[in-house]
Amino acid sequence: MDTSVMAPTRRNLLLHIAGWALTASDAVAAVRPEPSDRPLAGAIRWDAWYMPGSEPTAAVERSLSPPQYQSRLPFFARRDAEDHVSLPALSPKLMDLEIEQAAYAGLDFWAFVGYPADSPMTVALRQYLASSMRLQIRFCMFTQIETWGTSRAPAPLIDEHIALMKDEAYIRVADGRPLYFLGFITAAKANEKWGGTSGLRAAIERFRACAVAANAGNPYIVLAGSPKEIAGLAPMLGGDAVGAYVISDVRGIGDYPELVRIAEAGWQTLADADMPVVPTVMTGWDRRPRVEHPVPWERQQRPGSGIEYYFGAPRPEELSAHLRRALAWIQSQPADRRAPATLIYAWNENDEGGWLVPTVPCDTRRLEALHATLARGQQGQQPNCTVAP
């Protein structure tokens, strides 16, 4: 990574956070969420797409360059006369357009994957926070447990996220609590980083107490991991609900209905925690681009190894039916185990096979399928893919 870029971007984000802390009202913790007759619906944002020349952007350009995968490219990707793929820098107008697209779909929030402030993976979050349109779709954070640091050295990112919770666009559940995902939790990581589950529980309790003391509110914390493992760990960790970033089978093969069967069985496994479950809705799972061209952060992947394991893509009506079942499943739970939201994998995990963002040249069918479920009867301009000048 280019360290000459990192320092100013971290400084800028910290200045933004300081500004929010100074201008936030003391009553921010009591902000009422917008009323709804259904659980909230959000989508994960994994933003490797927006910083040309960075390691993550170069990696996804490479993974989606083969002709058989180019149909997955997000709508803003460029292809030259020789079919070379490039991804442009994120502009304010491009972010505004994505906000409009997500709002049309009826999404309530994006769950930004949390990274240190100097990472190129935070470019989209910074651009979103600078947008005057951001209240059209709110946001929260989905944080990997690794980025929280350790018991001896908690990461600065923890305080940064508490400050973000005070932004007026941060999503809050029905009782006004800011929604927060802490993910990829395993017993091994708890032992390595936090001295065991008791140490991680103490860190979660400190996070909660610091958020309350900062007047950000009492976070509604969703503990996420593989369904079977997190269902066993979560009751010991002091969260409010359980969930998963993705629910699939790394050695699975089949059509989209088979992936849906696995995902929905995963909801039931998560329910073994005897806690509310935020069900994950899968838009797909097909990692073949990364199998053919491994990305730097997946060091164990060998080119071609496991190429046969993938699931077919959904038809729009199959995707919307899966989402409707997730919303109905939440409502079917006992009142004390009814989660406030469902989480969609994903807005833009295109090279892993999970996306909602329009793809080249302007395929908006997945957004239209969501609109029919989440925003039925609401007026809205059809999504387009033209970035304003």
What are these regions (language model features)?
Residues L22-S25, T359:
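Alpha-helical transmembrane segments and their juxtamembrane interfaces
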Residues H16-I17, S25, P67, F76:
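Low-complexity, intrinsically disordered/propeptide-like segments
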Residues A7, A24-S36:
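C-terminal segment of N-terminal export signals and the immediately downstream linker at the start
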Residues T3-W20:
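N-terminal secretory signal peptides and thylakoid transit peptides that target proteins
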Residues M1-T3, R11, S25, E349:
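Intrinsic-disorder/low-complexity regions
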Residues V31-P389:
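Glycan-processing catalytic domains of CAZymes
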